[in-house]
From Swiss-Prot:
S-diacylglycerol cysteine-type lipidated residues: 24
Protein name as annotated: Outer-membrane lipoprotein LolB
Function of the molecule: Plays a critical role in the incorporation of lipoproteins in the outer membrane after they are released by the LolA protein.
Source species of the chain: Cupriavidus pinatubonensis (strain JMP 134 / LMG 1197)
Membrane-related topology note: Lipid-anchor
Subunit organization: Monomer.
Gene for this chain: lolB
Lipid-attached positions, N-palmitoyl cysteine: 24
Keywords of the record: Cell outer membrane, Chaperone, Lipoprotein, Membrane, Palmitate, Protein transport, Signal, Transport
Amino acid sequence: MPTMNRSRRLALLCLGAPLLLAACASVAPSRGFDAGEGSASRHYTGRFSANYVRYGRDEGVQGSFRWEEQGRNVRLDLLSPLGQTLAVVTATPSGATLDLPNKPPRNAPEVDSLLEEALGFALPVAGMRDWLHGRPAPGRPAKSTRDTEGRLATLAQDGWSVRYVAWQEVPSASQAPAPRPRRIDLEREGGPTPLAVKLVIDPEEAP
């Protein structure tokens, strides 16, 4: 029995070694935003999980995220459950950059395909700019439903099905509390492989 336990531990270490090595490696600082001065900024933190198919096998990953936006510019940090950086995404209207540990930055017009190629799953960063605020992205076709309180309940846009599972009230120093998404479930429609992502957003503090 001790031999079996040692074998199982060794197998788990071997399976997890690439992720741990990548997480412990350094990531180059992200490119600066190209927003003009005075652009409003917001910050979100929370947890994510993704279930996807890669090389014909079911895979899953979870961790935490940090989201910073300034105008239409976004920086997204994906962290392992131990807090090490897995990837840093910087997206601006002029393009996107993906930084991975110990690898040169990768640039593209949009980052979703870069993420999927590098990590096995994509996050719809362009849509999340608005979906995290509980609204459809402007200027693009969308179908939506609302709950009895007028909040967004479901949304179909950019090839993704978005479901608002829970909301939270965000305190304000000068106004009534505003509703903000607490949990969002996303599922890609018609992609090359199944992909489902869950986001749980930490409560915001009063300004």
